[in-house]
């Protein structure tokens, strides 16, 4: 059932994207809306199980990378946080799909639009159910790519093309910081799996253990504790996706896309990805003292 939640939107995207011209506009709309709605219903059932039966599971779908010390599976992590996000993403997406049937009724490219919506949903689900930072990053980039497709859907409008490129480029700035944060995590912890990373953080602060959290690293000429630098780099990624100050300029222009796109990206899905990242990494953020951010602001003021 859990795997169906993830792959139903992908199946909807493939059917509408590759076979839309054969099955027709109406069938493309129905297939995508129905499959995503089924995914939403199953997500609600999973959330019920998590809340009332304390259900938690890490479902391994496939072995992804096994090279040296890097061992990464494509997994589906079900816990309270991911269960809530499953409901948020699929319920909002299903409503947007249904609304799009009427809103896009006069558009000649309806199957392509519905395929993009479903693919965006799949990428977002891949993001929120990841059990490691690498899968999270791939879902993160998938969401960014789909947002580019959706914002620039009306490609004959120059303003839509400009807005799509702007959103894509600005988000890549944040994603670069996010990628550096993942590289640093692997360098310091030797793994990108959530459980292994989160378990090591407190153990490395125990008496008699090398004070990992006090290890000084230099980034852009500024000395950071290792954990503070990790949190800063991850937060830069969150700033891009959640359109926070300095990396927020893409958001107003993104309104150039069809209204359902604005609802899907801005209301409750893509912009929550940054918040999700910070919450998911809270076991690391717990060991990053707020004073480090005060020092950072002081350096910015001096600059």
What are these regions (language model features)?
Residues 1-297, 302:
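...captures the hydrophobic TM-helix bundle architecture rather than a specific catalytic motif
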């Amino acid at each position: 059932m859990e795997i169906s939640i993830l792959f139903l939107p992908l199946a909807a995207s493939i059917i509408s994207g590759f076979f839309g011209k054969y099955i027709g506009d109406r069938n493309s709309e129905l297939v995508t809306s129905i499959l995503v709605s089924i995914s939403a219903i199953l997500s609600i059932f999973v959330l019920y199980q998590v809340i009332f039966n304390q259900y938690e599971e890490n479902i391994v779908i496939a072995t992804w990378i096994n090279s040296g010390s890097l061992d990464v599976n494509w997994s589906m992590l079900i816990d309270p946080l991911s269960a809530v996000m499953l409901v948020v993403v699929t319920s909002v997406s299903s409503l947007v799909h249904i609304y799009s049937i009427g809103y896009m009724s006069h558009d000649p490219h309806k199957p392509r639009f519905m395929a993009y919506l479903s693919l965006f949903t799949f990428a977002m689900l891949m993001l929120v159910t990841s059990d490691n930072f690498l899968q999270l990053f791939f879902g993160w980039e998938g969401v960014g790519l789909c947002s580019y497709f959706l914002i620039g859907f009306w490609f004959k409008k120059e303003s839509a093309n400009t807005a799509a490129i702007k959103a894509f480029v600005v988000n890549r700035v944040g994603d670069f910081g996010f990628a550096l944060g993942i590289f640093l995590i692997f360098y310091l912890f030797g793994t990108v799996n959530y459980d292994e990373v989160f378990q090591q953080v407190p153990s490395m602060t125990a008496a008699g253990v090398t004070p990992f959290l006090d290890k000084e690293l230099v980034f852009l000429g500024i000395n950071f504790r290792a954990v503070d630098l990790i949190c800063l780099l991850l937060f830069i990624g969150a700033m891009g996706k959640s359109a926070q100050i300095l990396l927020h300029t893409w958001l107003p222009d993104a309104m150039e896309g069809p209204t359902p796109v604005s609802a899907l990206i801005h209301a409750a899905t893509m912009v929550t990805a940054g918040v999700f990242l910070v919450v998911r990494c809270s076991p690391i953020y717990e060991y990053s003292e707020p004073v480090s951010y005060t020092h950072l602001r002081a350096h910015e003021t001096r600059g």
